[in-house]
Amino acid sequence: MKEINPDIIFNLAAESQVLRSADNPLDTYKSNIFGSLNLFDSIRKLQINPKIIHASTDKVYGISDNLPYREDHKLYSNFTYDISKISADLIAQNYKEIYGLDITLFRSCNIYGPADFNYDRLIPHIVKSFIRKKPPIFRSNGKYLREYIYVEDLIEYIIMLTRNRGEEYIFNLGSGVITLLADLST
């Protein structure tokens, strides 16, 4: 990394599947916590100063009907995936504040778009259900509120974050449209 001396690093790597995280907590913690920690500490030791864009999730705020979330909303959850992302976020903040790394952290809502064939995720599952002319199955009663963002819109926002030079460094990225899950299937 020192030879390349990158201007920007996008830390997008993570175990992102909530169900798989629940089944494999150790692997999730290794990937999501130690993956980020290894990246940040390598940059610190190499004494390079790239802009780091660190990806997170609105799952760090837990489950709430108080949407959309604000960046100063309390971080809390009991779920493996969420805890792994909370931990990585706190480590990112630590390396920014204590070691001076140039980190901008974003927390996105649920992402949807083309080429998402993970049918454990709600939008691909609903599309597959429509194609098969079967009703979608919700893991909940469909009464949860969620915010969604189209993948290309998220990419535009992430690119804008590379130009962030202000004091604020934590951003929630979403569409601003809150949807009842059951409404997605109508």
Put a short name on every predicted segment:
Residues 130, 158-162, 185:
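Hydrophobic "lid"/C-terminal helical patch
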